[in-house]
């Protein structure tokens, strides 16, 4: 099917390796390794059945070094992309959760938002990880992160369990990553408007100029990035999954060809080992080219 589509579109894919899961020579070794990884939770038969699905097969291919990264989700839910990754790839040392971050672009402006896709009601400690990992993702996309821990309260102006959670998470972030510019808990208007910041949060190095926004839960985060995308004119790149031992990224089941293409490049760029990686300027150029392609495609589709 891939070769037929390439021929029909007059694309040269001679340099591409296409692996057919149904005729994969290393399937027996893959089954044995997955049985071992699942530690008795799955039989050989169950593992073979799982590996007949592209999400598990692709994840094991990454685990065994047959691929450097994985981009899925076009025909699977986010849960079906993340579950195999958690079971087989697992989180990086020091990370307890997988989270996600969207990069939103409008002209020369870039902002980051997390966690818009994975953690429904993150705890204080979850928010700490989400903020620190989202700041790292923001840097990859050429953003110097100024992190706003969003709430309906600014520095104690409101009360409630959510306010306490965000305020405590902010304190923990400052202890865990003292080099990171972070403010919270803070309302959105105070995080982006210098005039409002002067009234609500004077003297803050983040208030009024935040560019990395961490939401208290997935309701606020998912609604927030979609408002920015649909009404604010931003182009959304992501979600970029964070905290895993290998780059695994998720697409929306409503994705188009441009989004698949763009996220493929981003995912591949994230898979380059740190000691071999292009410099920050080079990586930013790659990402910028991807974003520009998405924006151009969006204008063309209009």
Regions found by a protein language model. Name each.
Residues 1-207, 211-279, 283-297:
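Anion-binding alpha/beta catalytic cores of soluble intermediary-metabolism enzymes, centered on
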Residues 299-302:
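Short acidic DE-rich linear segments
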């Amino acid at each position: 099917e891939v070769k037929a589509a390439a021929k029909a579109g007059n694309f040269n894919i001679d340099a591409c390796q296409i692996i057919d899961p149904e005729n994969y020579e290393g399937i027996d070794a893959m089954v044995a390794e997955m049985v071992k990884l699942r530690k008795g939770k799955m039989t050989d038969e169950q593992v073979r059945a799982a590996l007949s699905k592209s999400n598990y097969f692709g994840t094991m291919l990454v685990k065994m070094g047959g691929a450097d990264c994985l981009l899925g989700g076009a025909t699977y839910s986010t849960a079906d992309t993340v579950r195999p990754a958690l079971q087989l790839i697992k989180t990086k040392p020091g990370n307890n959760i997988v989270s996600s971050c969207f990069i939103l672009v409008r002209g020369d402006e870039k902002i980051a938002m997390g966690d818009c896709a994975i953690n429904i009601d993150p705890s204080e400690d979850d928010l700490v990880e989400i903020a620190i990992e989202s700041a790292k993702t923001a840097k990859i996309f050429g953003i110097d992160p100024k992190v706003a821990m969003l709430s309906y309260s600014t520095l104690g102006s409101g009360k409630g369990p959510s306010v306490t959670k965000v305020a405590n998470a902010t304190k923990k972030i400052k202890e865990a990553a003292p080099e990171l510019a972070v403010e919270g808990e803070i309302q959105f208007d105070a995080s982006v408007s210098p005039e409002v910041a002067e009234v609500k949060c004077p003297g803050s190095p983040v208030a009024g100029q935040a560019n990395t926004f961490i939401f208290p839960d997935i309701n606020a985060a998912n609604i927030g990035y979609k408002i920015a995308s649909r009404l604010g004119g931003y182009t959304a790149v992501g979600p970029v999954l964070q905290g895993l031992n290998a780059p695994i990224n998720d697409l929306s089941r409503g994705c188009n060809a441009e989004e698949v293409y763009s996220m493929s490049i981003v995912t591949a760029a994230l898979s380059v080992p740190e000691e071999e990686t292009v410099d920050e300027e080079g990586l930013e150029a790659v990402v910028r080219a991807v974003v520009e392609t998405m924006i151009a495609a969006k204008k063309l589709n209009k």
